[in-house]
Design a protein with these regions (language model features):
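Short, solvent-exposed loop/beta-turn-alpha elements that line the ligand-binding surface or hinge
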Residues: 14-42, 75-104
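Bilobed periplasmic-binding protein-like "clamshell/Venus-flytrap" ligand-binding domains
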Residues: 1-2, 6, 47-82
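Periplasmic binding protein-like
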Residues: 1-24, 56
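Generic hydrophobic alpha-helical scaffold/packing signal
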Residues: 10, 14, 29, 41, ...
Length: 104
């Protein structure tokens, strides 16, 4: 599986689907290559405006959904329980509790 290192779509899209990561040069083990995807990914990577960057990442993901270079077999879920007097229990992008927000 693949675990997110930091909260950005780039952390999945670039190493797993960029043409530059194919042919043994990264984790694109299916050797997926798409000029359209690469163009959108590179546009997102060059973008400094967060909203526009997100739009480019979304468009790149739409190309992946259309091409379907991989078939996801499972997705990580998280479940938790807490006492009724414990508040603000939430989880971060790695599915770990955000301990600094929990209050009693």
């Amino acid at each position: 599986g693949w675990m997110l290192d930091y909260p950005s779509a780039e952390d999945y899209l670039n190493p797993l689907y960029a043409s530059s990561s194919a042919d043994g040069h990264g984790s694109n083990d299916g050797d997926y290559k798409s000029a359209e995807f690469d163009k959108l990914l590179n546009a997102a990577l060059a973008q400094t405006d967060v909203k526009k960057r997100t739009e480019d990442f979304t468009k790149a993901q739409e190309v992946l959904a259309k091409d379907l270079p991989v078939i996801p077999l499972w997705n990580d879920n998280v479940a938790a329980a807490s006492a009724t007097n414990v508040k603000n229990v939430s989880f971060d992008y790695t599915n770990l509790p955000t301990y600094n927000t929990i209050t009693k």
